[in-house]
UniProtKB/Swiss-Prot annotation:
Name of the gene encoding the protein in the UniProt record: gatA
Protein's UniProt name: Glutamyl-tRNA(Gln) amidotransferase subunit A
One of the record's GO molecular function terms: ATP binding
Top-level lineage group: Bacteria
Protein family per UniProt: Belongs to the amidase family. GatA subfamily.
Record: active site: 71 (charge relay system), 146 (charge relay system), 170 (acyl-ester intermediate)
HAMAP family attached to this UniProt entry: GatA (MF_00120)
GO biological process: translation
Source species of the chain: Lactobacillus gasseri (strain ATCC 33323 / DSM 20243 / BCRC 14619 / CIP 102991 / JCM 1131 / KCTC 3163 / NCIMB 11718 / NCTC 13722 / AM63)
InterPro entries associated with the record: Amidase, Amidase_CS, Amidase_dom, AS_sf, GatA
Enzyme class, spelled out: ligase
Length: 479
């Protein structure tokens, strides 16, 4: 079964009406993945024997029997979880991440784990031990990263929704490149327990889907307190679907000058068109400045790489994961296991982070980056004193070609320039389709105050209802 023209509501109705059984839905989903994925390589693991939960309550649980894709850095009990790395290629977890436990309680069906950049470090899903994922709109283009597998699986109609993780744009950039919706909630809105750590002060699990409402339905389930994660907020979780279908009259919309100056030509026109839609509907558009935008890339890569170098110390060839053969002593085990188990990009970030944290460089690099991060947060706080939401482009350009930027790390890192700030500030941010640029999707980024995902959904839904981009079929999937 292909989901290009389906959503959670339509599938829920078919299940309630008996038009299809949950068992058949799972089987058809796996069958379609096997066929479609020959083109795009969106999956690392597919569960051939995927089965729905028992005693499904379709009326109570919107997600009951609905197949959901899971990014392969989210722990799943009894299902291989690799983070797209050689070092974890045979890792079989014995527990579920909190988000998985919550989805199981909601009776969702799990069909497999999606491809990604190794340990979520990348912007193209080319840095994977399991090969690159291709963009369903153009099979010679990247799907973005690091949640490129989840994005491609949704865009190609393999599933209606998928979980991803976002450390510097890893949900929003792939969402933009693939013409789907993707949301990174506020830091602390969703438990990170069971998410394989990259940058612990930046990581956040989120949702990707073709329709805005589908992400709202999934976020309703996975958000909220968790005794296993001390960083999760105790704030009450609203019904995010209640923010849909509203108008935007009187909404104060900030448009950062620095973001619009980063794009030109068709990309700028596509973004401006969506801003004009909001203006014509009665929103108040205000040009603003985020003066520290020029520092976000170096700040992020120092902070994220430093946290990564610490988090990845646990992969040593001893406790679990890949262990090198023909080693002479304990040091040899450490060195060879990590050298052979990690890919080039992961090793690059570990080295960068280790240097930034070293005694001679700490004050000049990590401490300075932490101080600049505070200034970036203050920029956003100031804007939100007089505005309800910030909008602008998600990326500076549409999807680039496979192999085009992989040998140029600096160029690859700059792909994140418009998305990183939301992670540094811990605010909710999403990307919603804004049209086509050179035949490839472009995304409008929407950001709001901490724990105000509702306004993000409100604006995204308004844009979606206006342009109906979800009706388009990815050109790479056309027969």
């Amino acid at each position: 079964m292909n989901y290009l023209n389906e959503n959670i509501d339509s599938l829920n109705k078919k299940l309630q009406d008996g038009e299809i059984t949950a068992e058949d839905l799972a089987k058809e989903t796996v069958k379609n993945i096997k066929e479609t994925d020959k083109k795009i390589n969106a999956w690392i693991t597919v569960d051939d024997d995927a089965k729905p939960a028992e005693n499904l309550d379709f009326a109570k649980n919107k997600l009951a029997g609905i197949p959901i894709a899971i990014k392969d850095n989210i722990i799943t009990n009894g299902m291989k979880t690799t983070a797209a790395s050689h070092i974890l290629c045979n890792y079989m977890p014995v527990y579920d991440a909190t988000v998985i436990s919550k989805l199981k309680k909601a009776q969702a069906t799990f069909v497999g784990k999606t491809n990604m950049d190794e340990f979520a470090m990348g912007s193209s899903t080319e840095h994977s031990y399991y090969g690159a994922t291709r963009n369903p709109w153009d099979l010679e283009k990247v799907p973005g990263g690091s949640s490129g597998g989840s994005a491609a699986a949704v865009a190609s109609g393999e599933v209606v929704a998928a979980l991803g993780s976002d450390t510097g744009g890893s949900i929003r950039q792939p969402a933009a490149f693939n013409g789907i919706f993707g949301i990174k909630p506020t830091y602390g809105r969703v438990s990170r327990w069971g998410l394989i750590a990259f940058g612990s002060s930046l990581d956040q699990i989120g949702v990707m889907s073709k329709r805005v409402k589908d992400s709202a339905e999934v976020l309703n389930v996975i958000a909220g307190p968790d005794e296993h994660d001390a960083t999760v907020s105790e704030k009450e979780v609203p019904d995010f679907t209640s923010f849909l279908g509203q108008d935007v009259k009187g909404l104060r919309v900030a448009v950062p000058k620095e973001y619009m100056d980063a794009v030109d030509g068709e990309m700028r026109d596509a973004i401006q068109k969506q801003i004009d839609v909001l203006k014509d509907a009665g929103a108040v558009i205000n040009e603003v400045s985020l003066p520290h935008t020029k520092y976000v890339v170096p700040t992020y890569y120092i902070v994220a790489s430093s946290e990564a170098s610490s988090n990845l110390q646990r992969y040593d060839g001893i406790r679990y994961g890949y262990r090198a053969k023909d080693t002479k002593n304990l040091l040899d085990v450490y060195v060879k296991s990590r050298s052979e188990g990690f890919g080039d990009e992961v090793k690059r970030r570990i080295m960068l982070g280790s240097f930034a944290l070293s005694a001679g460089a700490y004050d000049e690099f990590f401490k300075k980056a932490a101080q600049v991060r505070t200034l970036i947060c203050r920029d956003f706080e100031k804007i939100f004193e007089e505005n309800d939401v910030i909008v602008g482009p998600t990326t500076t350009e549409p999807a680039f070609g496979i192999g085009e930027e992989i040998s140029d790390p600096i160029k690859m890192y700059n792909n994140d320039i418009l998305t990183i700030s939301a992670n540094l500030a811990g605010i909710p941010a999403a990307s919603v389709p804004a049209g086509l640029v050179d035949g490839m999707p472009a995304g409008l980024q929407i950001m709001a105050k901490r724990f105000d995902e509702g306004t993000v959904f409100k604006v995204a839904d308004f844009i979606e209802r206006n342009n109906k981009f979800y009706e388009k079929t990815p050109t790479g999937m056309e027969d």
